[in-house]
Regions:
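Alpha-helical structural context detector biased toward long hydrophobic helices
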Residues: 3-32, 36-343
Length: 343
């Protein structure tokens, strides 16, 4: 089956190794899997004087925004925040102290360079321009976030995106199903319960992530084709970067990793980039619904995506923060525990 050929864990036959070096997954001991990358969360940390591994953000439970606010605003350590044990595990290496095959190494390719990319955005002149490679790098990680966040797999935006990818992916193979079925079931059932998955649904979700990132299934990968297709037509898409350089006026990020405003013709998807920046991806509905048809092609050359950079537009920030609160699942996070810094 297609999936079997693509699903190379490590010891592969020589002809396959030559053809598909990128299809390899490397065993590693990482078991705490973040669905919003630590590097993204650290851009919202408040205790910058400690080393990056020990930084914290404030967690605002949604009950804080009720008519009668309840619950505590807690400082949480990023290393353990928005992460789940073995969320992206495909299989454990037998008898090898905690080594496992998971999607972490593939994810980390998209996470490296995030901090530098954020720094580069601070240097852009305000006004209209073309998006630089750093902004595309950030956007790609945010799109990956839509697809890998277990809280959002039932959101309509994510279901539409997954649907576009699914038309190109093979059916989940029996081999893949058996791998997931062989994982310790009490741990798996904890994930199913926490994120409202069925076992077949969770298995398909992992298979989709594997299939879209693997360069053994498609080369360039289906994910690379998706991000290229998104930005391929400058008439159908634009980016708006909002920056707040003056300090103490912050942007939330939601546990869902995005917020959405939609009307009949346009989707506006908002992403926190840092405590003092957020990004809006505006895309026409017609282009969004046509994405699936663009994925069979090899991506076009580097996109010429229109970008507008705007500074200190606080009304936009308030709207963004309110949407984050309204569309989060359990909590929003930020650099401060003072409401006036956000609203």
């Amino acid at each position: 089956t297609t999936m079997r050929k693509a699903f190379i864990l490590s010891e592969c036959e020589p002809p396959e190794c030559d053809e598909k070096p990128y299809a390899l997954l490397v065993a590693n001991p990482t078991k705490g899997h973040h669905f919003i990358a630590q590097t993204e969360q650290r851009q919202n940390a408040f205790n910058l004087q400690v080393n990056p591994q020990n930084r914290n953000v404030y967690q605002w439970p949604l009950s804080r925004f009720d008519h009668h606010p309840r619950g505590e605003i807690n400082s949480v350590n990023i290393e353990k925040n928005l992460e789940v044990n073995n969320l992206y595990t495909l299989t454990f290496v037998e008898g090898d102290g905690g080594q496992q095959y998971n999607l972490e190494t593939w994810f980390s390719r998209h996470e490296t360079g995030y901090e530098e990319a954020c720094e580069s955005l601070k240097l852009l002149a305000p006004g209209k321009q073309l998006a630089n490679p750093e902004l595309h790098r950030i956007l790609n990680l945010k799109i990956l976030g839509l697809l890998r966040n277990p809280l959002t797999h039932r959101d309509y935006l994510v279901r539409e995106l997954t649907g576009a990818l699914n038309r190109h992916l093979p059916q989940t193979g029996t081999e893949f199903r058996e791998l997931i079925a062989r994982r310790p079931q009490e741990r798996v059932s904890r994930i199913l319960k926490e994120f409202d998955f069925t076992l077949p649904g969770y298995t398909d979700w992992l298979a989709d992530l594997y299939g879209m990132l693997s360069e053994g299934v498609f080369r360039p990968s289906l994910f690379a084709r998706l991000t290229a297709a998104l930005t391929t037509d400058p008439n159908q898409i634009r980016l708006i970067l909002h920056r707040y350089p003056r300090g103490h006026r912050y942007c939330f990020f939601a546990d869902s990793g995005y917020c959405l405003q939609a009307d009949n013709t346009m989707l506006s998807i908002g992403f926190n980039i840092a405590a003092d920046m957020f990004l809006i991806l505006q895309i026409t509905r017609s282009h969004w619904h046509n994405l699936s048809n663009l994925l069979s092609e090899t991506p076009p050359p580097a996109p010429q995506t229109p970008l507008t950079v705007m500074d200190n537009q606080h009304q936009q920030r308030l709207t963004f923060n309110r949407l984050c609160i309204r569309q989060a699942h359990h909590a929003v996070y930020g650099k401060s525990n003072q409401l006036s810094d956000f609203l």
